[in-house]
Amino acid sequence: MGAYSLSDLSADVQRLVDVHDDIRKRTRAIEPYLRRWMDAPDLTDAQRAPCDGRACGHLLHTAADGSFFIISVVFPPGTSSGVHYHGAWGVIGVLAGVDEETKYSRAEGPAEPGAGESCELAQTAKLHFPPGSVTYLLPPEQGYHRVRAVGEEAGVSLHILGGTPETHPHLLCHPESRTLVDFPMAALLDQVPPGT
């Protein structure tokens, strides 16, 4: 039996998405399969590299039914995502470097936000995830965060996210206006085809 590949992981995620409607159950069910893949990740050097020195994602798989997609995300040392909101579930596995994740919540409580709304947020946690760690996106109550690569090594992680790069709800907290602006996932991707 060969190594557990990205294709194997994608097939198992599809099966679990089809079975679990509840996002908490879905993300917990996906975790052991992601961990299995993380034992011997089959990413190319290009899929582990930043884009011209900046943070970016590399599209690895999009489900035919549009239910999820998989990207590798690379943050050069010291770079940050900025505070942003994911409006769909996600499971994230750290492959290299240390990700510092700062989580936030809205003062008015969990609610599905939209572009133009205020993003006055309170910090709820600051966590450090070394290689081998797995974390989750569980909106609306756990949809806001900021990720930063701490240390001297680039942060490389695999993200399994609900929707497609075009449909995954993704909003950036504009640092000056303190309002949410649309920030499509597709705009963050340097679409490196698998196997290149």
PLM features per residue range, with description:
Residues C173-T196:
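Long hydrophobic alpha-helical segments typical of transmembrane helices together
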Residues H86-S105:
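Glycine- and acidic-residue-biased ligand/ion/polar-headgroup-sensing regions
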Residues V91-G93, E152-T167:
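A short hydrophobic beta-strand segment most commonly corresponding to one strand
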Residues M1-P41:
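N-terminal leader/capping segments at the start of a protein or of a new domain
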Residues C51-P77:
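A short glycine-rich, His/Asp/Glu-containing loop-to-beta-strand
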Residues R106-Y144, D182, A186:
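Short acidic-glycine-tyrosine-enriched beta hairpin
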Residues G82-H84, E101-T102, L127, L137, ...:
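Short beta-strand His + acidic residue motifs that chelate non-heme Fe in jelly-roll/DSBH
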Residues I71-Y85, P139-Q142:
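Conserved short histidine dyad/triad with adjacent acidic residue
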